[in-house]
C-alpha cells in the first residue's frame, strides 16, 4: 500500500518507533534507512496541514521508495511518500510461495 500525498515540506515526515517520533532522515549511516517497523504509523506535521496514517495490521514501512532489499546509505526521497509492506516472500524459504487465504490490512487516515 503506497500513500503519496502532495506535501509542501515532505522532509517533515515522522515515524512512530517504540513510542518516539523519529524522522526517517535521522537514521545513522550504515543503519537501515530503507525499511522500518513502526508502532502506530507515520505522520506529517507541516504548515500546510497535519496528517497521520495509522496502521492497524502491518508494521513495515519503506519511506520514499518501495524497496525491500535495496540496502544503501542514501537518504530516502520523502516526496515519494510512504509505502507499507503487506505481504512478502522474497526469501523463498520456510514459507509457501503463495497465499491461499484472504487478507485484510486496515489503515486510519487523520487530517488536521
Language model feature labels by segment:
Residues 1-112:
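C-terminal (or distal) subdomains of carbohydrate-active enzymes
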